[in-house]
């Protein structure tokens, strides 16, 4: 399917998706809700390359969850980013206690495996935790993701150190054909938008209940702040159009 046909499919398929893609191309924030049958959580989502310290502050104060960067599966391979569970599994060969805590089949109630990779700071940071420093680390993750996809030879360790304060998430190789987490949903949107597929995600939490912010309250927040609210199913349907599976 050529680009113009894909554009027409998306243009007339879902106006909400079209708005979200335009917002992401402008480097701004949107909301993504995965599904009622999965985590049942809404994330604030923004392209990594566009993040400022004010965005980190916004996510930290208004969302309250972990501030993570979801990385495209092709870039993850190029950068040799491991899954955290695999690292712990390897380390458990010499540490029995690690073997007891590493993620096992059936541990997760919402999916088959976690997408967590390593936690990093950029080497130009001091402690890595202030909003300015986390924003720097996040932008640099976006930049190195873009470089890795352009075929440039890159050594991830030249720019980053671990442990750090920004969690990396490895998107599943098959993206939405394989997994419907916020990681894959945000990276799929980045691909559709034609932007670097490194996306910041942060769960929205509820101060009153101590749980994830409900879908309705998340929508209300979005309306108050002018954010596009997307659900996982509509992203999946648009992604199927974009990949040419349906049109």
UniProtKB/Swiss-Prot annotation:
Catalysed transformations (reactions): D-ribulose 5-phosphate = (2S)-2-hydroxy-3-oxobutyl phosphate + formate + H(+)
An MF annotation (GO) of this entry: magnesium ion binding
CC terms in the record's Gene Ontology section: cytosol
Keyword list, A-Z: Lyase, Magnesium, Manganese, Metal-binding, Riboflavin biosynthesis
Signal peptide boundaries: none
GO process terms (BP): riboflavin biosynthetic process
Cofactor binding notes: Binds 2 divalent metal cations per subunit. Magnesium or manganese.
Pathway: Cofactor biosynthesis; riboflavin biosynthesis; 2-hydroxy-3-oxobutyl phosphate from D-ribulose 5-phosphate: step 1/1
Binding residues annotated for D-ribulose 5-phosphate, in chain numbering: 38-39, 43, 179-183, 203
Top-level taxon: Archaea
Enzyme Commission number: 4.1.99.12
Quaternary data: Homodimer.
HAMAP family named in the record: RibB
Protein family: Belongs to the DHBP synthase family.
PANTHER family linked: 3,4-DIHYDROXY-2-BUTANONE 4-PHOSPHATE SYNTHASE, GTP CYCLOHYDROLASE II-RELATED
Descriptive protein name: 3,4-dihydroxy-2-butanone 4-phosphate synthase
Biological source species: Methanosarcina acetivorans (strain ATCC 35395 / DSM 2834 / JCM 12185 / C2A)
